[in-house]
Amino acid sequence: MSGSMFSVFSLLYLLSVCSACYISNCPIGGKRAIQDSPSRQCMSCGPGDRGRCFGPSICCGEGLGCLLGSPETQRCLEEDFLPSPCEAGGKVCGYEGRCAAPGVCCDSEGCSVDQSCVDGDGDATAVSQPASSQDLLLKLLHLSNPAHPYRLHQ
């Protein structure tokens, strides 16, 4: 009897440490299918299709800024129904985000002010002599609370 109990516990232990791909969250083609598929650019959105989708209701573009939850972002909802993942443009910033507009970092859940998304090399002279009022505002926000970025959620 004790041998069978040991076998049962051993089996349960092995099942608990194994990572499985369950039917509810397994991508088509298996766990590694998403990594193997080539990334595509996210759908265009906004007025005149000048922006790109960064989330289900986030549309950002150069010269456009970011639109959150507006009628222009409705097209971004379709992105969830496409079988392959997309990659929004811009360099990597924040935590799993991408630069969406000058000074703005967005991920699939929201956007935040991020100094690394401002064009330029970010040296000390840029802090002392900002190029525009937008740069000045971004620098003041960054200096006032560098530990907690200002996050705009939907």
UniProtKB/Swiss-Prot annotation:
Domain of life, source organism: Eukaryota
Disulfide bridge partners, by residue number: 21-26, 42-86, 45-59, 53-76, 60-66, 93-105, 99-117, 106-111
GO cellular component, one term: secretory granule
Keywords tagged on the record: Amidation, Cleavage on pair of basic residues, Disulfide bond, Hormone, Signal
Keyword Signal appears in the UniProt entry: yes
GO molecular function annotation: neurohypophyseal hormone activity
Keyword Transcription set for record: no
Gene3D superfamilies noted in UniProt: Neurohypophysial hormone domain
Signal peptide location: 1-20
Glycine amide, modified sites: 29
Pfam families named among the record's database cross-references: Hormone_5
PROSITE patterns per record: NEUROHYPOPHYS_HORM
General function of this protein: Isotocin causes contraction of smooth muscles.
Family: Belongs to the vasopressin/oxytocin family.
Protein's name according to its UniProt entry: Isotocin-neurophysin IT 1
Organism: Catostomus commersonii (White sucker)
